[in-house]
Amino acid sequence: MNYQSEWLRIDPIKGSRRFSNLCWAFILVLGAIGFSLVGFSSYLGRDLIPILSSQQIIFLPQGIVMCFYGIAGIFLGFYLWCTILWNVGSGYNQFNKREGIVYLFRWGFPGENRRICIRFMIKDIQAIRMEIQEGFSPRRVLYLRIKGQQDVPLTRLDEELTLREMEEKAAELARFLRVSIEGF
């Protein structure tokens, strides 16, 4: 949900709290626990869970490798659950004409630099740039072209916008900021 008035525009940005990330985290942790249990079952010589048979798996080398993959998967799953819990990457883009300032705010990982805020002047914005790559893995990203700096992405790299939505978003923002659009 965007907010726009005559002087202010706020575009919220979704972070890592997405349904696909929840599914991947859940599947990853379940698979990792299964691998770990089968590996430990092969070490003990008996099945810890009746559904997961380890009778044909010798501890050296298969069982130890399954334990390693299971533990690595648990750590990776823990990392993914933490990014979902902290909602890393979420935030907003705020364009304030009254103050003449653009704020790009994102949440990062906990610590000293959890709040990431990039600020620059609206008068330094040269254009809105669209990067469109079609094919097997399409990529559609909006950038702010700023004088003397590299282009700043406004949308996530994995955000799946249709070409029409991308053009509408770029046109609305260019109209609000009174700049041109590049990269058709």
From Swiss-Prot:
Keywords: Chloroplast, Membrane, Photosynthesis, Plastid, Thylakoid, Transmembrane, Transmembrane helix. One of its GO terms (biological process) is photosynthesis. It is found in: Plastid, Chloroplast thylakoid membrane. It is a multi-pass membrane protein. InterPro entries: PSI_Ycf4_assembly. The keyword Chloroplast applies. The keyword Transmembrane applies. It holds the Pfam family Ycf4. GO terms for cellular component: chloroplast thylakoid membrane; photosystem I. The chain crosses the membrane at residues 22-42, 64-84. Belongs to the Ycf4 family. Seems to be required for the assembly of the photosystem I complex. This is Photosystem I assembly protein Ycf4.
